[in-house]
Amino acid sequence: MHCPFCGAGDTKVTDSRLANEGEAIRRRRECQGCGERFTTYEAADLVLPRLLKRNGTREPFQEEKLRAGILRAVEKRPVSTEAVEAAIRRIVHRLRASGEREFDSQVLGEWVMDELRHLDEVAYVRFASVYRRFQDVQAFREEIERLERALSLEERAAQLSLLLDGGSLVNKSN
C-alpha cells in the first residue's frame, strides 16, 4: 500500500481489527519512508445483482437508493437508525444469497414492504402508497385492511404457538 502522504510504497501494518460488525478489517499502517500513520479498511467487494425495473430497463443495485426509500418511509416515525440499518442488511443479505445476476425490482419492493411492516405500520403504508401507485383513498383502505389481516394472522399464530407450548408443559407436569 502506498503512503498517502509521501507516496512511498513501503508501509507496515501496526494493528488490525474487525470493523463494521465483522464486515471489514480496519488496519493501522505506518509509512517506512516518512513515519506518518494512517488507517485503511478492507472489505469484500461483492457484486450485487442488477435490477430489472418495471419498464424493462436494468440498473445496478444501489444500497443508497434502498436506504433513501426506507428512510423516506420512516421519516418522523419512532424507528431507530439501528432498526433501519438492520432491515437494510437483511435485504442486502437476501439479494446476495439469491445468487442471481439479475433480480426483479418488484421482488425487492415486496421485501422492503415486509421489513417495513415489521418496523412501523405507518411507514409501511407510506411506502406501499408509492410502490403500489395508489390512485385514491380506496387503495389506502384496501392496503390497510390487508395489513390488518396479515397482522391478525401473525398474532393468532403467535397465540396458538403459546397455547401449544403451554399445553405441552401442562401435559408434562400431569
Curated annotation (Swiss-Prot):
Co-factor note (free text): Binds 1 zinc ion.
PROSITE patterns: ATP_CONE (PS51161)
GO biological process, one term: negative regulation of DNA-templated transcription
Keywords: ATP-binding, DNA-binding, Metal-binding, Nucleotide-binding, Repressor, Transcription, Transcription regulation, Zinc, Zinc-finger
InterPro entries per UniProt: ATP-cone_dom, NrdR-like_N, RNR_NrdR-like
Keyword Membrane listed: no
Gene Ontology MF: a single term: ATP binding
Domain named ATP-cone: residues: 49-139
Cofactor(s) recorded in Swiss-Prot or TrEMBL: Zn(2+)
The protein's role, per its UniProt record: Negatively regulates transcription of bacterial ribonucleotide reductase nrd genes and operons by binding to NrdR-boxes.
The protein, known as: Transcriptional repressor NrdR
Species classification: Bacteria, Pseudomonadati, Pseudomonadota, Gammaproteobacteria, Chromatiales
